[in-house]
Curated annotation (Swiss-Prot):
Record's catalysed reaction(s): 4-CDP-2-C-methyl-D-erythritol + ATP = 4-CDP-2-C-methyl-D-erythritol 2-phosphate + ADP + H(+)
InterPro entries with a match to the protein in the record: GHMP_kinase_C_dom (IPR013750), GHMP_kinase_C_sf (IPR036554), GHMP_kinase_N_dom (IPR006204), IspE (IPR004424), Ribosomal_Su5_D2-typ_SF (IPR020568), Ribsml_uS5_D2-typ_fold_subgr (IPR014721)
Name this polypeptide is given: 4-diphosphocytidyl-2-C-methyl-D-erythritol kinase
Pathway: Isoprenoid biosynthesis; isopentenyl diphosphate biosynthesis via DXP pathway; isopentenyl diphosphate from 1-deoxy-D-xylulose 5-phosphate: step 3/6
Organism of derivation: Azorhizobium caulinodans (strain ATCC 43989 / DSM 5975 / JCM 20966 / LMG 6465 / NBRC 14845 / NCIMB 13405 / ORS 571)
Encoding gene (name): ispE
EC number: 2.7.1.148
PANTHER family named among the record's database cross-references: 4-DIPHOSPHOCYTIDYL-2-C-METHYL-D-ERYTHRITOL KINASE, CHLOROPLASTIC (PTHR43527:SF2)
Amino acid sequence: MQRLVARAPAKVNLTLRILRRRPDGFHDLASIVAFAGACDVVTLESDAPLGLAVAGPSAAAAGPDADNLILRAADAFARHVPGARLGRFTLTKRLPVAAGIGGGSSDAAAALRLLAQINDIALDDPRLHAAAREVGADVPVCLDPQARIMEGIGERLSEPLGLAPLFAVLVNCRVPVPTADVFRTLGLRAGEDLAGLPHEAPMSTGRAAVMRHLVLHGNDLEPPAETVAPEITRVKAMLAQEPEVRLVRMSGSGATVFALTDDCRAAAQVARRVAAAEPGWWVRPTVLR
């Protein structure tokens, strides 16, 4: 029996452009995503009966174990890799739930990486990616957590962008925001496009160029998310008034907001002040890559 451990980092949408609502009801998007140091932790005891235990500060919010995406990922893996070795998972849940940072998807991807490892399957194996797509649209990009552009409903991924590290503060006001509610508030009809600038890759991967790019390309889900959860507006305003902050944006469908700073010391200072002012919020200084 082996005991293997994998990080499941928060996925942050640096940009998020909603292009259209497709006839099947899904939304085509384009997004630059990066991954944070803040993470959940997934452990696998190989060859034990398939199961899952959830612990950690966000365990209660994660919901019933049977509904967890980790078990769905294991089931999908077993379908695509007949006779695969499985095992018992433990999820240490640290990230907030329904927060716009892909926690559940990253957990599932970490579980798939561990299953691939004990079954000697490469990360680029088509069976692994097929299993990831079955579990959820955000799972494929989390399999190899590096900054990329994701398109379609999340299934089309660029090569790693090699972005310079971005120093950030992640803030979640502990208000769960269901993604379906945000898209419902966005209000696109089937077949309808959303007007806006074309989504483009940064011209350069250096920090200054990326920051200039992010100023021009925002998150189309911010307005509807702020309607669903007005507390997001207060988080953004609080971060925007901090002198070290260079850009404030919501990630995904919310409610997590990130603020970018010039260096890790500035991020830590902002995080300390916000956490002191709002001790009930989840606040983490981090590096996005």
